[in-house]
């Protein structure tokens, strides 16, 4: 039965996942509903799939098809009937790269982002799609245009290339911002924005979310 136990830390290192085929339809329906009600993407803790709905019926799901040594390999599926039926639309959205899905987000039926983090948490790559997930391309940020680094960068002897972890884009009107940090959990780094849905990115300064230091 289901027990209320705290997930052991090693779960992060060697994820055990249950293939979707073995999970009940009720469970799947429940997860889809949670994803529909969620503002962002929803991660199924049982099987590691990541689901996102742009509206009630139209959604996407990254499903784990293989896993090894803390990394997963995903395919991308789409529903147009609110999660009742799913169609595989992309067998390899991350172009052969394994990792842990960081997020999945669409802004209309065609334009969206997906993120794939390395198991160590030291790097993450954001991918963009303009055709509803049929193909993705990696976002390239112009690191050499960073004219300042975050407040503690000099103490840590960081250069721009030390910021390898791209956080999922934040939307503000027609502008999307990617914060770039040194590793998962860091509260400061540098950021880049795009006004053309991720085709070109511009350096937008350093940031620190550690309270009022240097703000």
Regions found by a protein language model. Name each.
Residues 1-25:
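Extended, non-transmembrane interaction/recognition domains
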Residues 17-39, 92-96, 141-158, 208-214:
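Surface-exposed loop and turn segments in beta-propeller and other repeat-based domains
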Residues 45-51, 97-104, 147-168, 211-214:
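Repeated scaffold domains used in trafficking and secretory/extracellular systems
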Residues 39-66:
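Beta-strand-rich domains and repeat architectures in extracellular enzymes and scaffolds
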């Amino acid at each position: 039965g289901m027990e209320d136990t705290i997930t052991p830390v090693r779960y992060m290192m060697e994820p055990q996942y249950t293939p979707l085929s073995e999970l009940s339809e009720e469970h799947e329906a429940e997860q889809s509903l949670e994803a529909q009600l969620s503002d962002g993407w929803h991660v199924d803790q049982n099987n590691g799939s990541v689901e996102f709905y742009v509206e009630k019926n139209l959604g996407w799901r990254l499903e784990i098809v293989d896993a090894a040594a803390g990394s997963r390999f995903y395919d991308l599926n789409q529903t147009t009937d609110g999660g009742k039926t799913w169609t595989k639309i992309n067998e390899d959205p991350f172009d052969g790269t394994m990792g842990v899905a960081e997020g999945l987000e669409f802004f209309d039926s065609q334009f969206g982002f997906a993120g794939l983090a390395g198991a160590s948490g030291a790097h993450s790559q954001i991918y963009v799609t303009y055709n509803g997930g049929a193909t993705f391309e990696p976002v390239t940020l112009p690191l050499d245009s960073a004219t300042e680094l975050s407040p503690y960068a000099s103490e840590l002897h960081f250069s721009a290339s030390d910021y390898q972890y791209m956080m999922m884009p934040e939307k503000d009107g027609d502008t999307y911002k990617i914060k770039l940090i040194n590793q998962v959990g860091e509260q400061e780094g540098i950021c880049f924005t795009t006004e053309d849905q991720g085709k070109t990115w511009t350096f937008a300064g350093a940031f620190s979310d550690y309270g009022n230091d240097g703000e």
